[in-house]
Amino acid sequence: TYTDRYIQEKIESGSSFADAWENIFGSLEYTAVMDQEPGREITIDWEHGGSDVMMARDVYRLIFEGREPWILSANGTIFKYDTKGIVPGLLERWYSERKELQAKKKDAQTAEDKAFWDKRQLVKKINLNSLYGAILNPGCRFFDKRIGQSTTLTGRVIARHMDAHVN
């Protein structure tokens, strides 16, 4: 990808991995699609194994003006949003369970009970925060680099967007 090559060139010129990403809040492919850059070719690798090369503006139209239930993450991965995946379903359940544990902590009468429920909700918080990191581990049954990258970069884009509107 353009992004992989760009980051690799920065690292080879002496930048650290973190410095190579300085001021880049989404993949170069994502930015090209969202800006509908003319002349920028994007390769789409489909789930069935085939590939298509399209102009960034055409990818934008395909995703946002087409009839498919698709959304584009900040790393350029196209996801379907008409069905809930295993990982989002699991996160939704854990989040709901954490909210219940936080409510029990709030309702607790003694310091010991508050500490107990606080530790229980903290375990859920750690589970929630760790899942996408685990998905980036090649030893994980659900290993998929795209999902971990999508979460990280999309979170960055959202934070940047919110910062621009708040500040």
Language-model features: locations:
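Conserved acidic
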Residues: T1-N167
